[in-house]
From Swiss-Prot:
It holds the Pfam family Metallothio_2. Metallothioneins have a high content of cysteine residues that bind various heavy metals. This is Metallothionein-like protein type 2. GO terms for molecular function: metal ion binding. Belongs to the metallothionein superfamily. Type 15 family. Keywords: Metal-binding, Metal-thiolate cluster.
Length: 84
């Protein structure tokens, strides 16, 4: 059974279908915080932790409102997504 029925919709919270797939962790989808602890990770010449911010964020499974009120990306709503 898919967590969101294979359908995306973009409502007031840009949620995903019936099962709440994209809205399952709303605190992670609505804000992202990057914490740098100096002395633990190698620093580059700009004072940033080496690597990209994308690696430090949730992982790209959240829905964002795109054009025509559709969730973009909507990979959380794939038919292969199974919530146990």
């Amino acid at each position: 059974m898919s967590g969101c029925g294979g359908s995306c919709n973009c409502g007031s919270s840009c949620s995903c279908g019936k099962g709440g797939g994209c809205n399952m962790y709303p605190d992670l989808e609505k804000s992202t915080t990057l914490t740098i602890i100096e002395g633990v990770a190698p620093m580059n010449n700009k004072g940033m932790v080496e690597g990209s911010i994308e690696k430090a964020t949730e992982g790209g499974n959240g829905c964002k409102c795109g054009s025509s009120c559709k969730c973009d990306p909507c990979n959380c709503c794939s038919a292969s997504t199974i919530w146990t």
